[in-house]
Amino acid sequence: IVSTAIESANPGLRRAHERGIPVTHRAAALSRALSGHKLVAVAGTCGKSTVTAMLGHILAECGLDPFCVNGANVPGWEGAVRAGKGAVAVAEVDESDKSLVAFHPYAAIVTNASADHYSKEEMDAVFDAFVAGVPGPVVDGRRERGEMPVSVPGRHNRANAYLAWRLATALGCDAEQARRALLTFGGVERRLQAYGPRVYDDYAHNPEKLHAMWTTLAEKFPDGICVVWRPHGYAPLRKMKDALAAMFNAVIRPQDKLLLLPVYDAGGTADRTLNSDALARELKPGACEQVADLDAAEAWCAAHADDFAAFATCGARDPGLPGLAARLAGRLAAEARG
């Protein structure tokens, strides 16, 4: 089973082809695995993992015992999977390689559409084609907006909660029971995940996700935040640099700081000529400090622990970011104890 990220020159993939071993894309494999369920597919540029987890939680609380497959780990699940025995399945489906077309769901949610892997116009066309083939309820966040109270912070999460609530009620869940279920939602790993009262970790990696994360923490901590962020790839940074610069220049307050790490290098044939330096040059004076690696980021944060009300690590791909958040939380807790 392979993803689109696996290049044709990958040694394991080449050996599989040489030996005649069948190779299947992960989307096709998951679609087959869920073919016996009434599938609800959750698509969109931002918020898919959170909405998938919210919907799974609501359906479970309403007695449907769904089978769920998410793009992120969920507390209380078996990692990213909830192995329910009911007839309904909920799955996050991926637009980054347009592999969502491998799925044939009964119902669907589209959270939103923005320029990320493709232009907004191309993303809209992909999502329009996807939902056109859905026979059951469709909740499309591009056209229908609302908010519902939910246990996790941020206006974006209240909007996510509304989409999950709408689809759950369309499937027959009692509206009030579904609303109450959102108040006991336990969150998703790496989605403003708290490591103590002053440290958070988030998966944010595009302008929309970073804006949601930053504004949520800024509202909670008006005295200032420090965010450690690593761009997750050279191609995404090249595509989003101008939008990232505009977003950071809009949200970073005088009392805030962005600690900018080098681009995460996952190998392969990427064009590495544009890096974090290019983004840093476009940010307003004093907004950004560049650091060489996670150790340097940790040392900088420790030296400035009293300068900010809260710290956050964020970015995709780099497995070391949650560990940095945990270490920072430990340092701050030790200092608080004296």
Residue ranges with predicted function:
Residues 29-33, 144-148, 266-267, 294-299:
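A short acidic, often aromatic-flanked loop/helix-cap motif at beta-alpha or helix-coil junctions
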Residues 149-155:
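A short glycine-threonine-serine/GTX helix/turn-capping micro-motif
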Residues 4-137, 142-146, 165-168:
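Phosphate-binding loop of NTP-binding sites
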Residues 47, 157, 206:
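Nucleotide-sugar-dependent glycosyltransferase donor-binding/catalytic pocket residues
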Residues 53, 128, 154, 163-338:
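ATP-dependent carboxylate-amine ligase
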Residues 1-3, 91-92, 110, 227, ...:
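Redox-cofactor binding/interface segments in oxidoreductases and associated redox assembly factors
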